Structure formats: C-alpha cells, structure tokens
C-alpha cells in the first residue's frame, strides 16, 4: 500500500443539500484523512482553468456554468491508495451506473450534477491540489 494524496471536490448541488458533513464522514470511515479543505465559489475563469482539459468537449460550458452556480468544498485527502479509494467511494461518473452506497448514487442529481469530483491518477491529483492549495495549506496528519 502506498500513502498518497488525492484531490476532491464536493460540488454545488451536494453543498446545497447540506451533505458536506455526510460526505466527509464517508472519506474518514474509509480511512482517508482530510489534510486541507476550504469552501470557495469559483469564478468562471477559475472553473475554465481547472477544467481546461475538457475545453473542446460538448459538455464544457454546462460544466463551467454548474461549477460556478454555488459554493464548493475543495479538499486534499491522504491515505493508502487514496486516489483509488476515493474513486471507489465516489462511484461511477454517471449516477445511474453508480453502485448503491456510493456518493454519486446517494447525492448526484444527474451526469453533470454528480455531487463530487476526484482525481483520476496521482499525476492529476498533484496538479489539481496545486491549483487550489499551496504546500503551506496542507497539514500532514501525525496523530
């Protein structure tokens, strides 16, 4: 097992449902520690920058509009195989395909409003973490 960090977003629809605490409890019960977190309301420019890899995709404008529609929680999760574990907790991107008990099965409203985002690889995690957090913002958990 490899101790690693991953990046996570609780999206506007899940924040609006007051699901932050319930989602954080799922991370922690799966052995992931929250080592940085903050609430932000993305500007269009920030959302376009974060999702730049999807700029040419047909869903890009809708995604940016959704991600700027309300506040989000961004967090860094740390644990053994954090990227894989978080993706298991989240469930399939399309909530109709998500297994019962996953975050998307429980909190998503649609494919676009799918409640959470999580890095898909350690390299993506590193890039996404750096987009929102400086090294000084991250508090390694020693206890």
From Swiss-Prot:
Its cofactor is Mg(2+). It holds the Pfam family NDK. One of its GO terms (molecular function) is ATP binding. Its main location: cytoplasm. InterPro entries: NDK-like_dom, NDK-like_dom_sf, Nucleoside_diP_kinase, Nucleoside_diP_kinase_AS. This is Nucleoside diphosphate kinase. GO terms for biological process: CTP biosynthetic process; GTP biosynthetic process; UTP biosynthetic process. Keywords: ATP-binding, Cytoplasm, Kinase, Magnesium, Metal-binding, Nucleotide metabolism, Nucleotide-binding, Phosphoprotein, Transferase. Major role in the synthesis of nucleoside triphosphates other than ATP. The ATP gamma phosphate is transferred to the NDP beta phosphate via a ping-pong mechanism, using a phosphorylated active-site intermediate. The keyword Electron transport does not apply. Homotetramer. ATP binds at residues 11, 59, 87, 93, 104, 114. It is found in: Cytoplasm. Its EC number is 2.7.4.6. One of its GO terms (cellular component) is cytoplasm. NCBIfam families: PRK00668.1. It catalyses: a 2'-deoxyribonucleoside 5'-diphosphate + ATP = a 2'-deoxyribonucleoside 5'-triphosphate + ADP; a ribonucleoside 5'-diphosphate + ATP = a ribonucleoside 5'-triphosphate + ADP. SUPFAM superfamilies: Nucleoside diphosphate kinase, NDK (SSF54919). PROSITE patterns: NDPK, NDPK_LIKE. Belongs to the NDK family.
């Amino acid at each position: 097992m490899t101790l690693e960090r991953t990046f996570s977003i609780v999206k506007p629809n899940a924040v609006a449902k007051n699901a932050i605490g319930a989602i954080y409890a799922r991370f922690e019960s799966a052995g992931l520690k929250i080592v940085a977190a903050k609430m932000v309301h993305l500007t269009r420019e920030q959302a376009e920058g974060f999702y730049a890899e999807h700029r040419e995709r047909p869903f890009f404008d809708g995604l940016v509009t959704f991600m700027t529609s309300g506040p989000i929680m961004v967090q860094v999760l740390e644990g053994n195989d954090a990227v894989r574990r978080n993706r298991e907790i989240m469930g399939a991107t399309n909530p109709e395909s998500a297994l019962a008990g996953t975050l998307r099965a429980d909190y998503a409203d649609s494919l676009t409003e799918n409640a959470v985002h999580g890095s898909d690889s350690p390299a993506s995690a590193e890039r996404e973490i750096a987009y929102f957090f400086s090294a000084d913002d991250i508090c390694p958990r020693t206890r």
